[in-house]
């Protein structure tokens, strides 16, 4: 499907002051399931299925509007503590969503990137991620970033281990360590920090997501549960962002 967004939906959105990078914590799937149990069949044992159905319209809306990078918090390191059934269901949904979104990524020249400790994922899912990442790697103007088995603390630990190894091997010196150098060891080294972080579901926390990167990010929290999050809600977040004055900590 080509990149389209109805003009009437863009009312009061300035295309000159868009966030370059938007990140989303897609929260509320399980609460949605509890509220809509009569709609959930035995096969779809949680709201994750319905959360996955919300993805395409938000992805399309973001890139149609002109967002360059969209990062989605799909699966945290802590999510492995959930039931085996739920974890397996999530991995199955990831695999099917990658297949479904692949033609859209190709048609609209969007690159897939994945961040997190991917080595702990099922081999079949790792292979699917590698396949689509390779086939879209030349699409350099828009990035869809999936955070899978991702935790901000885990990312920093992995980064510092790599930095320490380079110190031991004398590839870098201790005097060269700076914010800029540390950034090069992060999963997100090749992308800008988020300008806007959207969290659905109403919880007022960042849940170990992009801890280094969101130091100066604008936060937008909505009570809308993720399966109910629609393009108009996404645009509400963009409008709210555009009414803020970013000071970068100053």
UniProtKB/Swiss-Prot annotation:
At the top of the EC hierarchy, this enzyme's class is transferase
Q: Where, by residue number, does Mg(2+) bind? A: 27, 218
What's its EC?
2.5.1.-
Where is substrate bound in this sequence? 28-32, 48, 76-78, 80, 82, 199, 205-207
Identify one Pfam family in the record: Prenyltransf
* Alphabetized GO MF terms: ditrans,polycis-polyprenyl diphosphate synthase [(2E,6E)-farnesyl diphosphate specific] activity; magnesium ion binding
Q: Mind telling me which InterPro entries this protein's record contains?
A: UPP_synth-like, UPP_synth-like_CS, UPP_synth-like_sf
Keyword Transferase in the entry? The reply is yes
Per the entry, the cofactor note is: Binds 2 magnesium ions per subunit.
Q: Which residues form the active site?
A: 27, 79 (proton acceptor)
Enumerate the cofactors the protein uses.
Mg(2+)
GO BP annotations, alphabetical order: polyprenol biosynthetic process
Q: Which UniProt keywords apply?
A: Magnesium, Metal-binding, Transferase
Per the similarity annotation, which family is this? Belongs to the UPP synthase family.
- Main role? Catalyzes the condensation of isopentenyl diphosphate (IPP) with allylic pyrophosphates generating different type of terpenoids.
Give the record's subunit note.
Answer: Homodimer.
Protein's name in the database:
Isoprenyl transferase
Q: Which organism is it from?
A: Chlamydia caviae (strain ATCC VR-813 / DSM 19441 / 03DC25 / GPIC) (Chlamydophila caviae)
**Organism placement in taxonomy:** Bacteria, Pseudomonadati, Chlamydiota, Chlamydiia, Chlamydiales
């Amino acid at each position: 499907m080509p990149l389209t967004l109805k003009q009437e939906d863009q009312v009061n959105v300035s295309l000159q002051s868009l966030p370059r990078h938007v990140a989303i914590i897609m929260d509320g799937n399980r609460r949605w399931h509890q509220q809509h149990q009569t709609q959930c069949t035995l096969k779809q044992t949680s709201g994750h299925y319905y959360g996955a159905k919300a993805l395409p319209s938000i992805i399309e809306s973001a890139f149609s509007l002109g967002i360059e990078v969209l990062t989605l918090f799909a699966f945290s390191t802590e999510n492995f503590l959930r039931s085996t059934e739920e974890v397996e269901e999530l991995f199955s949904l990831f695999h099917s969503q990658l297949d479904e979104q692949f033609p859209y990524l190709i048609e609209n020249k969007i690159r897939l990137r994945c961040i997190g400790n991917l080595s702990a994922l099922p081999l079949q899912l790792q292979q699917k991620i590698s396949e689509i990442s390779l086939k879209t790697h030349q699409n350099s103007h828009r990035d869809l970033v999936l955070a899978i088995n991702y935790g901000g603390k885990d990312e920093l630990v992995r980064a510092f281990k790599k930095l320490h190894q380079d110190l031991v091997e004398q590839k870098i010196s201790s005097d060269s360590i700076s914010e800029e150098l540390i950034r090069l060891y992060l999963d997100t080294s090749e992308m800008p920090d988020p300008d806007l972080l959207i969290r659905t579901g109403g919880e007022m926390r960042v849940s170990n997501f992009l801890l280094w990167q969101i130091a100066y990010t604008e936060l937008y929290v909505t009570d809308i549960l993720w399966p109910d999050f629609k393009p108009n809600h996404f645009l509400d977040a963009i409008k709210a962002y555009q009414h803020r004055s970013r000071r970068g900590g100053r």
